[in-house]
Amino acid sequence: LNQMGLPFPTSLLITPSTMYDLAFQLPRMAAVLTRSAKLGAYSRLNKSHCVLILGWAGSDDKSVKKYADLYENRGLDTIRFTSQMKAFSPKGLSHMRDMDEIFPLLDQVENKRLVMHIFSMNGVYSLVSLLHHKKYAYLFSKTDGIIWDSCPIDSKLLPYLLGYNQVINNVHKKTLESGTLFDKIGFMGGKMVFLSSAVMEAMRQWIHVSTGGNRSEVNPYYYVRDHPQLPDKHTFFYSTTDVLCQAPPIQSFHEYLTEKRKMEVEANCFTDSPHVKHFPLHPMEYNQGIDRMLTCVDRFYNPNSKL
């Protein structure tokens, strides 16, 4: 029975993701569509395009909005959304994140093409969940470029778990610092549920591949990398000092796109910026990367563009 004397629904008792959510009591972040009122360098592109921004785990709307502002000041509409972290589901890629909040906003820009800005693996999981939704499976076919910040990675199990442990600690820093003993016990229980689900997910992927299955069917890194409708233009921002999403798998990802899939790739690898902190430390390079992506898209749709 809960505190009101009512029984918990049976489904809540058997779902690792629900156990994680109950332990951490995570708030849902609203998805936001902003119509740019600015007359910027890319206002003409705004007639045909919108920027979709998927945030990193633990980010608040204020932090993600700073990146939306970069596009809105250039004259472009944006949709921004950060999905909740959740325990891994045995249902696989289609249930990695709950994306219902963003559906009505995507419907409002249904007639526009997209440029995507993806942050960390939480953004990748959000993207993969969207692509597995029947109504939005086409999103890559209407996307002209993707900017990747601190992602994507395909980590080995141990660094994978260590990275997630750090992410969870960062997300729930206040609980660790000032929570009651009961809060901290609940936190540890929730974290164990999450990390256990990550181990089970790694085992599920290993069994799938070992029995002849394609890893792109179970692993988001390869699902995106090998997706037949993946757009041709990509910009990467990552760092050799990022301990959460380390540089080697990101480098392997963009090199594969360049060498095997013959796509247009710009890679910006820094040596001093931590996870999702490349813009604060390297604002000039970051803005230039955004401009080059948007200019490339603009010239394709507006051949007479002087940008």
Where in the sequence are the language-model features?
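Short, surface-exposed "cap/lid" segments of acyl-processing enzymes
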Residues: 30-87
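Catalytic nucleophile-loop/oxyanion-hole region of alpha/beta-hydrolase
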Residues: 84-108
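Active-site loop->helix "elbow" adjoining a glycine-rich segment at hydrolase catalytic centers
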Residues: 119-123
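Short glycine-enriched nucleophile-adjacent loop
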Residues: 126-135
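Active-site nucleophile loop of the alpha/beta-hydrolase fold
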Residues: 145-156
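Serine-hydrolase catalytic core
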Residues: 187-285, 289
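Catalytic active-site module of serine/aspartate enzymes centered on a nucleophile-bearing elbow/loop
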Residues: 281-307
